[in-house]
């Protein structure tokens, strides 16, 4: 039979959600965008109209309590990843959380315990782990087609000098290392 579509709720109106994830979701046969929550209600209404999302919330709490949502996408600022992912799972939702899933290693145990106690998946959204180009590169390395790895040098950068940008505030975004430094680290471990 036909697979049931996963009904998604989006927490916030982050750029990654607006420009990458939500467009991908509306083009997928297995997903349905059913709700968005943003503290900026004007932005939520705009995105609701743009992506044909029927429910608009101005409180994250209301979205995660919606019984018509199966899974939540969490692209909130980094310091909010753990608390809102846990709250969503405790409300019976699976969670796809943007990277880094936490700002402290000690928070990972709490995420794992929440998964075990709720039976809901909490997964970190990391393009490196799922993109076909990286799978191809990994298989070429595994098959010995491009030699043996002896050392890895990685660099990932962008120009962002706006002091108001969350990526530049170590207290809420973790600073450059947690925001983009994770890419070369995760890629080498992949």
Report residues per predicted region.
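Glycine-centered tight turns that cap/initiate beta-strands
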Residues: 30, 52, 68, 145-148
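Alpha-helical elements of Rossmann-like donor-binding domains used by nucleotide-donor carbohydrate transfer enzymes
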Residues: 20, 46, 59-62, 71, ...
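N-terminal Rossmann-like dinucleotide-binding module
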Residues: 1-51
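Rossmann-fold dehydrogenase core element
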Residues: 109-127, 148-152
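Short active-site oxyanion
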Residues: 31-35, 70-72, 174-175
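Beta-loop-alpha module in the N-terminal Rossmann-like domain of NAD(P)-dependent dehydrogenases
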Residues: 51-114
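Predominantly a Rossmann-like dinucleotide-binding segment in NAD(P)-dependent oxidoreductases
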Residues: 128-190
